[in-house]
Amino acid sequence: MNTRFELQELVTLARRHSGFYASHFADIPPHISSLEQLPVIDPVEYWKGSHDLDHWPVLTAPLNDALVFKTGGTTSAGKFSLFRREEWQTLVTDFGRSLDAQLSAGDRVANLFFAGDLYASFIFTHDALAQVETEIVEFPFTGHIDSNLLADAIDRHRINVLAGIPAHLLSFAAWLEQNGRALEGVTALLYAGESLFDAQLQRLERVFPNARVASIGYASVDAGFIGASHRDCALGEHRAPEGHGVLEILDEQTGEVIEECGRVGRLVMTNLTRRLMPLIRYPVGDRACWREPPGTSGRKFALMGRCADSQRVRVGILTLLPQSIGETVLRITGSDDWQLVIEQDDATDILRLHWAPDALTPANAEADQTLHSALIEDYPLIRQLSADHLLVLQIRCCKVQELARHPRSGKRQHVLDRRVYNGSGQGTC
C-alpha cells in the first residue's frame, strides 16, 4: 500500500479525521499551497491525552493493526508513538536503503541497540538492516550483552561494524581499556540517539584504532526518519530524506523560515508517510542549521543541540522530560524557577539542576538532597551512569537572577545545553 501523501491530501485527511487537527487547522482555508500557511504544532497540546490511546484526539482512526512504541519516560509516564504496519514498513525501508551509504558488502554488523519496555531502537535497526540492498550479516545482540561475551564474539566472528547508542559504545570502550584490550578488526562505529563529542571520540579511538565513526542516521520514534547519514557528512551532519518528509528550520523566536546556511533555528518535520498519527510541522526538539543552499537534492544540515523548549532531552542513554522535572521541582520546593544545564568534562556529562526559591517559600537545607533523590527515583539510569563515571548530577539552589534567559526574548530557558557539538565548527555554504 502506498503510504506517501501529498501535503494537501495529508492536511485534508488530518482535519477530517483527527479532533486535534480539526481544531489546530480551524482558521486555515480548505486548500493550501505551502507549509508556511500552517501553524507549527505545540508539542504540549499535541501529546495531551496520549495516555489513553483509545480516545487520543490526534489519531485519525481506531487503534487497529498498529505498532505501539514508547517515546521518552517510563512506560506509565511516557508518551506513545503509533504506526500502522504499512507505515512502519515504509519507515524501515526508507531508512534501511539510506544505510547503503555507510555499509559495504560483507560487513558484519553487531546490533547493540536496546530492546524491551516498548523501546523501538533495536527493532527499528533490525528491520532497517533487513532492507539494506548491500549483502551484510547482522548479529542482533541487543545492548544488554555482557562486555566480555561481546568482545569475544567480535573476535571470533570477525564482526567489523558496531551499531549502538554512544553511551553503550563508550561503556564498552571503557571496559576494553580497563582490561587492556583493543579491537583492531572493527572498521566502523555507527551511533544514534545522542551526539558524540571530541573527548568521547578519543576514548573510542584508543580501543577501536581502525574504526571510522559515523551516525547511522537521524530518526526518532515520534517524528520518524529525519536525516540520512552519507560518507560526505561530518559528525552531526545529515541529509534531508526526500520523499519521506519535509524539513524546515525556523527562527526560535519569530517562527520565520530560515533558508540561508549557518543560521541556527529549531528543526521542524512534516512526515509524508504517517496517517494514523499525523505529524505536520512538528518540532522534533533539536536545533539545526543548513549546510547547503536551497534547492540542493537531499539538502545537508547540521545538528546544533537541543531546543530550550524541547519536550525531552537525551544525555547518553538517559532521556529526561523537562516538564516532569519542573513538576518535581515545584512539588518539592514550591518554586517554578529552575533550569537544567548540560555540560561536559572530558567524556563525562555534567547535569546541573539550578533552582531559585520562591519569596514565600524560602530554601531549606534539605531541598537539594530531596531533589537529588527524587530525580534518581524518577530516572534510575542516573545511578548507573554515575557509577560508570559517565554522568555527574548536581543540584544547586541559587538566586533567580542567576538563571539564564534568552538573549533576544528575555524568556527563561528551562534547558541550557552547553555541550560543544561537532557541527558548530563547520563553515557555512
Q: Could you describe each region identified by the protein language model?
A:
Residues 190-191, 217:
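A short, hydrophobic beta-strand element of the alpha/beta-hydrolase
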Residues 18, 165-166, 193:
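Helix N-cap/beta->alpha junction signal
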Residues 48-182, 188, 197-203, 207-208, ...:
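Active-site phosphate/ATP/adenylate-binding loop shared across adenylate-forming ligases
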Residues 11, 186, 211, 335-337:
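Core-facing hydrophobic residues within beta-strands of well-ordered domains
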Residues 162, 268, 273-384:
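AMP-binding/adenylate-forming catalytic core of the ANL superfamily
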Residues 14, 205, 328-330:
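Hydrophobic C-terminal alpha-helix "anchor/cap" residues
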Residues 1-70, 76-97, 347, 352-354, ...:
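Nucleotide 5′-phosphate-binding alpha/beta core
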Residues 196, 202-294:
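Conserved AMP-binding/adenylate-forming
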